């Protein structure tokens, strides 16, 4: 279920790319909090704590401002550095206890498909509605004994109590296919023919 972490924040007063770079050099992440009809609030969050917290993209955070006021927020958008993979900016959405929200949740696969087959996930994540303070980290499907041509549909997804999958029943989550083995014999013949052809061209060029 969702992590609930307290992070002390400060109000951001300087804006622009230069100010953002300066904040990051100081170990802070610029962020904006949206929600509940309020004007967006610009904050600075400690980089180390925040980066660890949002490894789970649905982490529930409690941000504590300078006045000691606490607000529950969820990551809405996480912008990362293209090379360093550090968090450059966060968009956060404020939530309340008891409020239902829809988030993308990872699909985990259990079981083994029939011999000679393999499964392909059509959905790596699925939308799930749950209490903002009790979000699942993952949902599960079973492919145990599934054979080629079988499909795992939305109703087959195992969702924790209190959560609801937000997909139509006919949506395919995973498909089981027959493993196609490459004929190495044919490949060897083709390589041999190519080698003979190259050798013939080489001899012709010497004449």
UniProtKB/Swiss-Prot annotation:
Q: Which SUPFAM superfamilies match?
A: Ribosomal protein L25-like
**Keywords of this entry:** Ribonucleoprotein, Ribosomal protein, RNA-binding, rRNA-binding
> Entry's HAMAP family?
Ribosomal_bL25_CTC
Looking at the UniProt record for this protein, which Gene Ontology cellular component terms does it annotate, in alphabetical order?
Answer: cytosolic large ribosomal subunit
Which source organism? Micrococcus luteus (strain ATCC 4698 / DSM 20030 / JCM 1464 / CCM 169 / CCUG 5858 / IAM 1056 / NBRC 3333 / NCIMB 9278 / NCTC 2665 / VKM Ac-2230)
User: Which ranges does the record mark as transmembrane?
Assistant: none
Q: What is this protein called?
A: Large ribosomal subunit protein bL25
Q: Which Pfam families match?
A: Ribosomal_L25p, Ribosomal_TL5_C
Does the record bear Ribonucleoprotein in its keywords? yes
Gene3D superfamilies in UniProt: Ribosomal protein L25, beta domain, Ribosomal Protein L25, Chain P
